[in-house]
């Protein structure tokens, strides 16, 4: 039995210099698991609650000492002595202990740190790499990365309304070569921006954040960078967007306001706007193309683009099986973004991935804009054979930690490692 004998929660800092929760779980055998949780900037209203202290005199109210205290007291008492290999039972214990629908009492940040640390300790105890512990012998597929090379919206201080412009290398036969492709495009883009006298400063997720006059200008520049790096847009590399449309949706008026372009659009008009971009550029994936509460708009977008473009629900589904089930039944979107801190335990995370796959939806494993050096999501991506990962640009060590872990996993898998390329979009025609 892998009995838990000690649990230590602590406050550490994330990639934005804000406090977050880290947890150590020690087992009877002496092995330890350590995990740190991320934090988002643009968040869905139905995400599990991240517990913050609210003391404005300390870290501007963003301290997490209450969450840490919950780990070191209540949670510790509840799971001390339990078997770390019983992940589902441990997570259910945490959920029952919290007793709320949104994990607002103990805090999803406290619960997730414990859930992850327990899994890492159990994997160590079993002598297995984490991806293998999660997925067993069937875990062998590396994910296609969504590489966020231009940041806008809530992730940058510029004129772009769309939050993320991403490249997805798809013609390569290994993750290593896909990563090289993305890195070369990133550096080609930096040179193009510098030559134009545009900013090469990076945003929260490591992408550039220059002031483009329009979304089309940004996309054209990315296509130039792909070609400058020696690749073919539409063949070797596809494009992806994260609109984060909830951030510029005005519910009272029912309009999407693209301030950077001086546009006010209805849901139908915004769906047409996105369809026009897909006609002009090799866009294979659009995340949060409509606001989380605009389900009619989502239905319009899905009917218009859902057979040829991956439509990913992030704020829409918030990694929640109840909401995802409703979306599947109504034919909303065709993919879910998986963010472990939106739901707060690994068991619930895996349930959302499984539900998506059974319905023919894709699942994209994702970081948050406020990250840490923790690379668990890389192991989740391979352990679940998700096929896609979204973990930032080709700069900032908090993003590189995930990419480098995927390189290690691919090396560990050896000849049985596979890279899906365009096959990652198994539900598109």
From Swiss-Prot:
List of catalytic residues: 205 (proton donor), 339 (proton acceptor)
Keyword Kinase: no
Cellular component aspect of the GO annotation: cell surface; extracellular region; phosphopyruvate hydratase complex
Binding locations of (2R)-2-phosphoglycerate: 163, 339, 368-369, 390
Catalytic class of the enzyme: lyase
GO biological process: one example: glycolytic process
Catalytic reaction annotation: (2R)-2-phosphoglycerate = phosphoenolpyruvate + H2O
Keyword Cytoplasm: yes
Cofactor: record remark: Binds a second Mg(2+) ion via substrate during catalysis.
Pathway as given in its UniProt record: Carbohydrate degradation; glycolysis; pyruvate from D-glyceraldehyde 3-phosphate: step 4/5
InterPro entries (alphabetical): Enolase (IPR000941), Enolase-like_C_sf (IPR036849), Enolase-like_N (IPR029017), Enolase_C (IPR020810), Enolase_CS (IPR020809), Enolase_N (IPR020811)
Transmembrane portions of the chain: none
GO MF term set: magnesium ion binding; phosphopyruvate hydratase activity
Entry keywords, A to Z: Cytoplasm, Glycolysis, Lyase, Magnesium, Metal-binding, Secreted
Location of the protein in the cell: Cytoplasm; Secreted; Cell surface
Cofactor(s) this protein requires: Mg(2+)
Main location, first listed in the record: cytoplasm
SMART domains in alphabetical order: Enolase_C (SM01192), Enolase_N (SM01193)
EC number(s) on file: 4.2.1.11
Binding of Mg(2+), residues: 242, 287, 314
Family: Belongs to the enolase family.
Biological function: Catalyzes the reversible conversion of 2-phosphoglycerate (2-PG) into phosphoenolpyruvate (PEP). It is essential for the degradation of carbohydrates via glycolysis.
PANTHER family for this protein: ENOLASE
Protein name per Swiss-Prot or TrEMBL: Enolase
Gene that encodes the chain: eno
């Amino acid at each position: 039995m892998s009995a838990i004998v000690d649990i230590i929660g602590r406050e550490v800092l994330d990639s934005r210099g804000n406090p977050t929760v880290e947890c150590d779980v020690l087992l009877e055998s002496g092995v330890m698991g350590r995990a740190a949780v991320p934090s988002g900037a643009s968040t869905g209203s139905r995400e599990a609650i991240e517990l913050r202290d609210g003391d404005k005199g300390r870290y501007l109210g963003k301290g997490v000492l209450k969450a840490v205290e919950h780990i070191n007291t209540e949670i510790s008492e509840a799971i001390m002595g339990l078997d770390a290999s019983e992940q589902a039972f441990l997570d259910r214990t945490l959920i029952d202990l919290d007793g709320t629908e949104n994990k607002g009492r103990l805090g999803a940040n406290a619960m997730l740190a414990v859930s992850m640390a327990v899994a890492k300790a159990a994997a160590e105890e079993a002598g297995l790499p984490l991806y293998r512990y999660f997925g067993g012998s069937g875990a062998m597929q590396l994910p296609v990365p969504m590489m966020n090379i231009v940041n806008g919206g809530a992730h940058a201080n510029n004129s772009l309304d769309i939050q993320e412009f991403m490249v997805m290398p798809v013609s390569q036969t290994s993750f290593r070569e896909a990563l090289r492709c993305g890195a070369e495009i990133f550096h080609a883009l930096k040179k193009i921006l510098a030559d134009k006298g545009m900013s090469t400063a990076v945003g929260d997720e490591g992408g550039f954040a220059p002031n483009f006059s329009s979304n089309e200008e940004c996309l054209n520049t990315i296509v130039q960078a792909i070609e400058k790096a020696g690749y073919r847009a539409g063949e070797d590399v596809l494009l992806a967007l994260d609109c984060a449309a909830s951030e510029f949706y005005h519910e009272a008026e029912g309009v999407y306001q693209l301030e950077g372009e001086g546009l006010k659009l209805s849901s139908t008009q915004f769906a047409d706007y996105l369809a026009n971009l897909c006609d002009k550029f090799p866009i294979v994936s659009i995340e949060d193309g409509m606001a989380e509460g605009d389900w009619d708009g989502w239905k319009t977008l899905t009917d218009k683009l859902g057979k040829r473009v991956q439509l990913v629900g992030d704020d829409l589904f918030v990694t929640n099986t109840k909401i995802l089930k409703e979306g599947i039944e109504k034919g909303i979107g065709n993919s879910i973004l998986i963010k472990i801190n939106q739901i707060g335990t690994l068991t619930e995370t895996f349930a959302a991935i499984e539900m998506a796959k059974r319905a023919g939806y894709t699942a994209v494993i994702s970081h948050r804009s406020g990250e840490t050096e923790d690379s668990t999501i890389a192991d989740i991506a391979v352990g679940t054979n998700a096929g896609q990962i979204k973990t930032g640009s080709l700069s900032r060590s908090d993003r590189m930690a995930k990419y480098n872990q995927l390189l290690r996993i691919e090396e560990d898998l050896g000849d049985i490692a596979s890279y899906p390329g365009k096959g990652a979009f198994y539900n598109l025609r």
